[in-house]
């Protein structure tokens, strides 16, 4: 046996393996890092506002549809708008991953109650809402509250495991989005307002990597001021859903502080003629923001 020849053969083989291993290490070292969340980091979300300018009544209904197929619904409007809400959800795939009810007033939760009671081909995975104290609400209820709607809502939620009650200080992540909650029902709410249902509206921020939107339900002016004093810059967002359909006086400082590029106002034609709403629309524009409402040619934005 030629030992020298055999040695050279093994040496050549070893050198080849070493070179290959070195190339592999260099490739791993020089290749761009891929974050663990790469699967959701590239997802974009289209937020769309719905509403009939000639309906003669206010309502609130939004969808947030992800490029990954996930769907989030916010409120939905009146019970007699059920067919439209149902058709909209069906057009987006019929599967609702999160249905968020800002507060159980008829112009926000009516359609949801009907669909949840009889879903048909619509699948609802989770429901998020504020847990309002029944006795406190009953004590301070107003005629516009339509209290039986709240009772219907609570009866439905008492019989399901899909409900997840949320309030101030809660947060979670969903498919790359971050949800932060700043308001909900609180036992100290009547120190700020005795309008229990509106005052308990979920105020939450939905954030992507670069843009965000703040939803405020129907909070009143005093609640908005308290939130700014408590959460400060955490509330600042790219987009805003105007509180209480753009209504109520004393909102200027709130709109100025949030500093949204685009503000959605859920107000049909008749409501936009109300002095407080008209003034708020003027103020938003004077502050440099755009207003999207039921007559706008564009009624959607992208969170990414």
For the regions a language model picked out, list residue spans one by one.
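Core dinuclear metal-dependent hydrolase active-site scaffold
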Residues: 36-94, 162-236, 301-304
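Stable alpha-helical elements in mature extracytoplasmic
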Residues: 81-88, 108-112, 146-153, 215, ...
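Active-site-proximal beta-strand/loop segments in catalytic clefts of secreted hydrolases
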Residues: 50-52, 74-77, 101-105, 130-132, ...
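N-terminal secretory signal peptides that target proteins for export/translocation
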Residues: 1-11
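Bacterial N-terminal signal peptides
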Residues: 17-32
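Active-site environment of divalent metal-dependent phosphoester hydrolases
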Residues: 57-58, 79-81, 104-110, 134-137, ...
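Binuclear metal-ion centers of metallo-dependent hydrolases, dominated by the metallo-beta-lactamase
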Residues: 126, 134-198, 262, 267-304
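Active-site metal-binding motif and surrounding structural segment of the metallo-beta-lactamase
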Residues: 67-70, 79-133, 230-247, 259-263
């Amino acid at each position: 046996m030629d030992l020298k020849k055999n040695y050279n053969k093994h040496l050549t083989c070893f050198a080849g393996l070493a070179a290959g291993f070195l190339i592999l290490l260099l490739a791993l070292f020089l290749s761009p890092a891929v974050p663990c969340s790469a699967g959701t980091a590239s997802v974009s979300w289209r937020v769309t506002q719905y509403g009939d300018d000639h309906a003669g009544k206010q309502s609130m209904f939004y969808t947030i549809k992800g490029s990954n197929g996930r769907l989030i619904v916010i409120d939905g409007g009146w019970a007699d708008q059920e067919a439209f809400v149902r058709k909209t959800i069906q057009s987006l795939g019929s599967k609702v991953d999160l249905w968020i009810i800002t507060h159980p007033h008829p112009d926000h939760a009516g359609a949801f109650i009907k669909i949840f009671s009889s879903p048909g081909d619509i699948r609802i995975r989770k429901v998020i809402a504020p847990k309002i104290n029944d006795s406190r609400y009953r004590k301070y209820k107003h005629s516009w509250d339509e209290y039986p709607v709240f009772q219907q809502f609570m009866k439905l939620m008492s019989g399901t495991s899909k409900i997840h009650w949320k309030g101030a200080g809660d947060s979670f992540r969903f498919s790359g989005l971050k949800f932060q909650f700043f308001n909900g029902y609180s036992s100290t709410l009547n120190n700020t307002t005795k309008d229990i249902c509106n005052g308990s509206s979920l105020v939450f921020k939905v954030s992507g990597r670069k843009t965000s939107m703040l939803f405020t339900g129907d909070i009143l002016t005093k609640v908005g001021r308290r939130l700014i004093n408590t959460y400060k810059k955490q509330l600042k967002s790219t987009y805003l859903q105007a509180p209480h359909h753009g209504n109520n006086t004393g909102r200027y400082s709130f709109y100025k502080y949030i500093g949204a590029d685009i503000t959605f106002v859920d107000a049909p034609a008749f409501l936009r003629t109300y002095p407080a709403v008209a003034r708020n629309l003027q103020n938003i524009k004077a502050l440099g923001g755009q207003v999207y409402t039921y007559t706008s040619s564009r009624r959607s934005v992208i969170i990414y």
